[in-house]
């Protein structure tokens, strides 16, 4: 599904179902050097259980045109414009990693417009080491391999999740390289990391959130370990935590737990 957002064609995956204005909607927001496909299992489940899903490719990523956001705040304004373009007065937001901060910022800016907020693999502050920031700029393929190593806690997904023989490291590395190549004008890897590293408004934003908040955390996450989310958890007025046995790419490593956890959260 393509939407005109701020004058640019913006791609949203709908989970294999046509958009139905009579149903509630969940917007999924990916992290750095990812695209809509990281949500493939969760979006398909929700789309076939009574929800509209819009899994966006952020501007300058994957199939979406436009300039890649330079900050969490800039990306949040894109998501707000996406809601306008889709004609949505109200929606649930689900974000992973950088996407979780984007979803938080949108919810803070427009609290009456967000029914539920799910922050998956999150942390605040979401600092990136200076060495990794520099590597993402000057040696992006080396940085991809390093990040990929620390983003997974298993070589293959659990049985029945993605089919026998699926290699999580290879799948994620190929995606990251593809997203990097999708925008020859801008290093979206470095730009996304800078956006995470420079974001300072997390606790201020959470203070303005009035809707239910779900934190989905991977117990073996080395990129955003659960302890790094505790400041946000403590600041959430209506928050609860779901911890799953997975690393940072928990949507792929614990797909059923994440999908069912989101589904249970969204009906409340």
Where are these regions (language model features)?
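Active-site glycine-rich loops that stabilize anionic/oxyanionic intermediates
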Residues: 31-34, 97
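Flexible "cap/lid" loop of the alpha/beta hydrolase fold
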Residues: 101-147
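Conserved alpha/beta-hydrolase catalytic His-Asp/Glu region
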Residues: 134-208
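Short beta-strand element of the alpha/beta-hydrolase
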Residues: 22-31
């Amino acid at each position: 599904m393509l939407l005109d957002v701020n004058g640019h064609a913006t791609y949203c995956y709908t989970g294999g179902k046509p958009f139905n204005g009579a149903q509630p909607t969940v917007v999924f927001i990916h992290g750095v050097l990812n695209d809509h496909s990281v949500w493939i299992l969760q979006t398909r489940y929700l789309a076939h259980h009574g929800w509209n899903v819009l899994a966006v490719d952020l501007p300058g990523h994957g199939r979406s045109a436009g300039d890649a956001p330079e900050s969490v705040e800039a990306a949040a304004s894109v998501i707000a414009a996406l809601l306008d373009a889709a004609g949505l007065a109200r929606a649930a937001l689900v974000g992973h990693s950088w996407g979780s901060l984007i979803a938080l910022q949108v919810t803070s800016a427009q609290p009456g417009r967000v029914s539920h907020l799910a922050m998956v693999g999150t942390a605040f502050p979401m600092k990136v080491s200076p060495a990794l920031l520099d590597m993402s700029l000057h040696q992006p393929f080396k940085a991809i391999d390093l990040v990929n190593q620390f983003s997974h806690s298993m070589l293959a997904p659990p049985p029945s999740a993605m089919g026998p023989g699926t290699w999580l490291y290879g799948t994620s590395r190929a995606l990251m390289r593809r997203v990097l190549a999708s925008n020859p004008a801008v290093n979206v890897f470095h730009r996304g990391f800078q956006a995470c590293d420079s974001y300072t408004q997390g606790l201020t934003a959470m203070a303005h959130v009035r809707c239910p908040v779900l934190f989905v955390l991977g117990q073996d996450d080395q990129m955003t370990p659960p302890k790094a989310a505790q400041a946000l958890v403590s600041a959430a007025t209506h928050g609860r935590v779901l911890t799953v046995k997975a690393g940072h790419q928990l949507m792929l490593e614990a797909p059923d737990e994440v999908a069912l956890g989101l589904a249970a959260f969204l009906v409340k």
